[in-house]
Structures are given as C-alpha cells and as structure tokens.
C-alpha cells in the first residue's frame, strides 16, 4: 500500500493529497441509496420509489454513525504512526477489530429485530410499507459488511493511505449499479432487488479490502495476539469517534424528520378535496 507521510512536505499539499480521496470516497459511499432510487424509479411505481427513499435514508444514517466511530480508529492509528510507535498501532488495530465486531453484531440485531417498527416510525405510506420493511431488513443483514469495510478503510487512512479505500468504494458503486439494473430491471425484484444489489456490492468491497490488507500486510509485526479487546484503547476510539458519529447522525436524522413530514403532510390535492 502507498502510505502518505503526513509529517513531511508542504502541509497544504499533503493535506489535499490525503483529504480529497477521502471526501470523494465518502460521497460515493453515500450514493448507494441514490443509485437504488434512480434505477427503481426507472422500472417501478411511486410506492417502490418511496420505499427505497425511506429505507436508504435509514441505512445512510446507520452508515454515517459507523463511519464517524471508525474515525476514532483512524485518528489513534495516525497518532501512533506519527510517533513511530508500531506496538501501539498494532494494538489499536487489534482492539478495533474486536470493538467493531461487537458494534456490528449489535447494530445488525437491533435493525433486524426492529426493522418493521422503524418503518412505522418513518410514517411510511401504506402502499410502500412492505417494500420498505423488506429493503431495510435486507440492508440490515449487510451491516457487518459496512462496519468491516469502514474499519479496514479506517486502518488504511490511519496509516496514510486514503486512495486505496476510494478504489474499493468506486468498485462497489459500479457493482451496485450493474446489479440494480439486473435485479430490478431484468428480474423485476423491485426494492428488495435493489437492497440485495447494495448488500452484495458492500460484501464484495469488504472482501476485496480485507484481502488487500492481508496480502500487502503492514510494515510492522502484527499477529493474532494483537487481536484482543483493549478497554483503554476502545474507550479512546469511542471518545474520539462519538462526536463525529453524533454530528453525522444529527444531519441524517434531520433528513429523516423531513422525510416523515413529507409523508404525513396532506398533498395539495387532499387539501382541495377536504374543502
């Protein structure tokens, strides 16, 4: 992997070299739901479009929270890397694997168990309710892929490599769009097909990212003994990542509220008919 040494060279230049790929990757990751929405809109009715719009916004909120928390891992690894403390880097990586495995399992269980309740809380239109539940349920099964991908990318960014994660998410977007057209356009699976496409793309992206990390390895010793939960490091990861996760969550929740208001407010036609 090509690691960028952020402690040397011109600060503005190095910062741009690192930040631009990171920003583009985040934008592409947010476009999963947009791709689903576009393709479903080409082949299905308005109820299906509403289901994907609601479901993708819910999943985007979850993704934002995960991305925010993994930033804590990136920051700790970057600090240890700058200090040339390879043991601290290895311990942070190992502890993060445990921490985010737990977070991923908990989020998956919560979303799978309460996907129907979440759909109801979103004031989903009756005609779109079943498709919304299906979309959220299928996407929830893939939460571990979202967590795993963001952890791997967080590790790479902490080591100074922000370009490789961009390639991973770019590939995932292409796979998602292709599968959307196949499952929604050719097989007419509607929102469920779009959700399957998204989860498959995320799974492929995570698998390739994990394979890349394994094949390329680290410039320091990292063994199975390093993969253990360190409470101090885990607390620091959460302390650093929680404010960013909260910020992303609040932004996405505001969009969720707007979505709810759109589906609870009477349309102009309904207002005219009530007069």
Regions found by a protein language model. Give the residues of each.
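Single conserved hydrophobic/aromatic residue that forms the stacking wall/gate
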Residues: 263-275
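Residue-level signature of transmembrane alpha-helical cores of multipass secondary-active transporters
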Residues: 22, 139, 165, 236, ...
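Hydrophobic transmembrane alpha-helices of multi-pass small-molecule transporters
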Residues: 61, 176-177, 206-210
């Amino acid at each position: 992997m090509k690691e960028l040494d952020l402690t040397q060279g011109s600060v503005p230049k190095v910062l741009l070299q690192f930040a631009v790929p990171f920003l583009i990757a985040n934008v592409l990751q947010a476009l999963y739901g947009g791709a689903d929405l576009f393709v479903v809109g080409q082949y299905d009715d308005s109820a299906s479009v509403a289901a994907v719009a609601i479901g993708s916004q819910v999943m985007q909120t979850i993704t934002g929270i995960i991305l925010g928390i993994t930033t804590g891992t990136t920051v700790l690894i970057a600090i240890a890397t700058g200090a040339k403390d390879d043991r601290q880097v290895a311990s942070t990586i190992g502890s993060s694997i445990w921490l985010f495995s737990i977070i991923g399992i908990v989020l998956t269980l919560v979303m799978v168990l309460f996907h129907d309740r979440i759909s109801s809380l979103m004031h989903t239109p009756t005609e779109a309710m079943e498709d919304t539940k299906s979309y959220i349920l299928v996407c929830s099964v893939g939460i571990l892929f979202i967590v795993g991908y963001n952890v791997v990318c967080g590790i790479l960014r902490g080591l100074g490599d922000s370009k490789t994660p961009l390639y991973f998410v770019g590939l995932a977007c292409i796979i998602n769009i292709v599968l959307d057209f196949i499952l929604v356009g050719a097989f007419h699976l509607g929102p469920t097909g779009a959700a399957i496409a998204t989860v498959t793309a995320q799974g492929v992206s995570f698998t390739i990212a994990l394979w890349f990390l394994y094949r390329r390895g680290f410039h320091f010793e990292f063994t199975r003994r390093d993969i253990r939960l360190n409470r101090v490091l885990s607390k620091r990861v959460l302390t650093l990542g929680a404010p960013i996760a909260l910020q992303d969550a609040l932004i996405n929740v505001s969009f969720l509220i707007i979505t709810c208001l759109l589906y609870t407010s009477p349309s102009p036609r309904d207002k005219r008919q009530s007069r």
